[in-house]
Amino acid sequence: MRRWNRAAARVAIAVGLVSGAVAVHAQNTAVRINVNAAADRHPINSNIYGVAYASTEELNDLNAPLNRNGGNNTSRYNWLQNGDNRAQDWYFESIGDASAVAGERGDTFIADAKAANAEAMLTIPLLDWVAKLGSNRSKLASFSIAKYGPQTGNDWQWFPDAGNGIWTSGQYVVGNDPNDANVPSSSAFQQAWVQHLISQWGTNASGGLRYYILDNEPSIWHSTHRDVQPTGVTMDQMLAKVLDYAGMIKNNDASALVIGPEEWGWSGYFYSG
């Protein structure tokens, strides 16, 4: 009999709790939300829309106002040789464009954008090294297998000597010479390119290039570009670079718009490399 009484009591308590919960919810007042889609309307700035590496035809089809030249390889673009280093994306190879004309890549990109009444956005390298080409514009490798030994991967089809920078032990190749496939870069080196762009197209105020992007994904340089930047850049170092290069650009074209740092994700703005 006691067991039955205890069980009945538990049921009664449970029912009471449920009833209480229902009663509490029943006391909530209804909320009514009205949205007036016609109120406080304003035009959306068209420059929130853009694409990357679009052709003139694609820009016209999409009616896109911005066209971005960016990505990992642009961090190592050498405007004098018109080539870049593909970094971790492709065996850390320095590869030349089809044209040997200095700055041709940027000039063609701007011309294609202007033909579609779009604005070009060019990436200016901030890394301390940019690509170097071999004789007759031949490829060069940052992690030559002949020089640094067997590695876990290589460009077996197109450039077999170009390794992936990982020894067969699984460890990263360390102590490599950046000069193997690169040359030093600085704001003075990049200033010559900015001045070339201004001489070709004018200042932003006179219809030239409007947007200069400060490099690409600096918080992961030590991964993407570990052949020339094996340690992570600190926030203080990045700030110094931004001030240096942005100041250089504005000194040459006060009307230019400088964008950066161009990061890979939100965490790049909170954590150093």
Predicted features and spans:
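N-terminal secretory signal peptides that target proteins for export/translocation
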Residues: 1-7
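Bacterial N-terminal signal peptides
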Residues: 10-20
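Boundary at the C-terminal end of the N-terminal hydrophobic targeting segment
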Residues: 23-26
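N-terminal catalytic cores of secreted or lumenal carbohydrate-active enzymes
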Residues: 28-273
